[in-house]
Amino acid sequence: SHWNAAEMGPHRDIMGDLLVEAERAGMTLGASSHRVEHWWFLGHGQEFDSDIKQPMHLGDYAWPAMPERENQDLFSEPMPTDEFLTDWLLRCCEIVDRYHPRILYFDWWIQHSAVKPYLQRFAAYYFNVMESRGGCVINYKHDAFPFGSGVPDIERGQFAEAKPFL
């Protein structure tokens, strides 16, 4: 996409700058990704007068969003396409390759059934790349990963249901 800080402004690599300064200060760099939600999230902007109108094209600031009946449903349709999920996977790998964040936070919707195989491939890639750099941690929501294999995000101070004690 051309919608990035280097091309659209402020014409520099903000994440790269953060990496340099974090290392200089002895801090750990973390990153977050909310991209998988682009499958449907910006589609709601078409429900009222906004700047998110069809036709959108690949390379626009967001993926051409699909209508989503129920974004909490793990099997909701339309399912993300292989093209979309491959794009998501490559963008996540680019974050790892360029910035080597020790912590990577994913917001919800990575637990969708269509995302699971791509998420597994990403986690294997991330853990393998970062092993020689001292390891890494994935933060996730809901049941995107088996309990104990990453750091679950706990919002509002508690889980919605009981979880095993480790």
Stretches with model-predicted labels:
Residues S1-L166:
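Mature catalytic domains of secreted/periplasmic carbohydrate-active enzymes
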